[in-house]
């Protein structure tokens, strides 16, 4: 009996992909989300991501105004930082250049090391500031215009001690007619020793041997050590005033005098270099003579300092450099004076003349032979003691 018929294997037929029917229209999904579209019968390498066919337009950015060509937006923070760094570097280079330029123009011509028998140094720093009648660099026309005369050599028209300390700055005017002892000294050029010459006017010491003997005489009669020396002549003074555009002052009364050449009317006005020089030089026609002149000099320095150290001058190179050039070209200082020392002197002057310190004449006891002025030595000793110990000044004129 035959066995059961074996099971037949049907050949496997691979059917082709059936075409998809039409996609039914999507119903409106909640919250406006568009469902992903189904594949249209081919292997789509991009299908499967959630962002495909969802209505998102690729290459159009995120709606924040991106570059249509795919370039990154500018990094303004980085640009600002680079700009600031560049400005700082430029300012640094200019500052360094200005420092070396100014330092090269300083006339370090006074050697204080040759001054003999110097007093012991105290606290703070003491400057001797001198205005001389030097006519160096002035033509005949300039001398006539500035009423300087034609006297050979040079003398001192003003002398001031400026003390810079932690307890306040002090400026003391020394009348040129002060009756003092000119001590023995060694000639700055000859090297010869000269004996003391007895009482004389203070400015006579400058006439004999210039700055070194003047410093020696001031130290000998006060007991106060002078740390630095600064001197400016007629021409330099007038140039500085003209460089800042003149100095505004309130003239208390009409002033006219032929020796100084001053001719000013009462009231507030701007003095040019010529007028300013006449104002600080005048002593004839003033009730107090040399004492009144020192007060006028203090008033003018106050106005000059306050009007020079302003943003309109310091931050304006077209004004700052002419002012610095005019001052440095004619300013004579000691060999150890640095630009920092000079700046300290200037700012202390501005502080004092602006009311932030003490401004006074050397205390006077009365008159002396030859129209001289005798110092009140009791007050002078107290004043020097306060300065040497850097104490607030309590002495009055």
Please identify what each model-predicted range represents.
Residues 2-397:
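Non-catalytic, solvent-exposed segments at the cell envelope interface
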